[in-house]
Amino acid sequence: MSRLTLLVTFVVVLALEPITTGNAAPSGDAKRGEKLFSTLPCVSCHDVTKPWPGGDICPNLGNIATEAARLVRTREYRGKAKTAAEYIRESIVEPNAYIVPGAAYRAADGQSVMPKDFGSTLSGAQIDDIVAYLLTRR
């Protein structure tokens, strides 16, 4: 095989390789995430059976995967996430990155009512599990 043929073959193979865009499924386990979500204080504020945003205390999360994917493409969103998984993770570890519009979701100081310490009190694996679970809520 000539060098030119090898080079062309190599370029074609590279062109066919999938490029990672951050849309890959999270490494977490959705079943473990569901259990964590129901045993941590998450369920005391969030309802996963009703559609987003809604909710009296915090946004409902019944269709958060769909809404998060839509939200990160809007002008109103000011966070850093580019995918639904990134948005959900950001909401857990950095809840002030984007606060869903609505007075009920803000404390008197204008900050999110979501606890700000989950990034330090939960392990990375636990957060991955919760993200994986919430991505099942379409």
Say what each PLM segment does:
Residues 1-3:
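N-terminal secretory signal peptides that target proteins for export/translocation
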Residues 5-18:
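Bacterial N-terminal signal peptides
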Residues 15-27:
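Bacterial Sec-dependent signal peptides at the C-terminal "C-region" and cleavage site
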Residues 26, 107-138:
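C-terminal capping alpha-helices of c-type cytochrome domains
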Residues 26-82, 93-107, 136-138:
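Periplasmic/extracellular electron-transfer cofactor-ligation site
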Residues 56, 87, 109-111:
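Extracytoplasmic
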Residues 79-86, 121-125:
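Soluble non-cytosolic domains of exported or imported proteins
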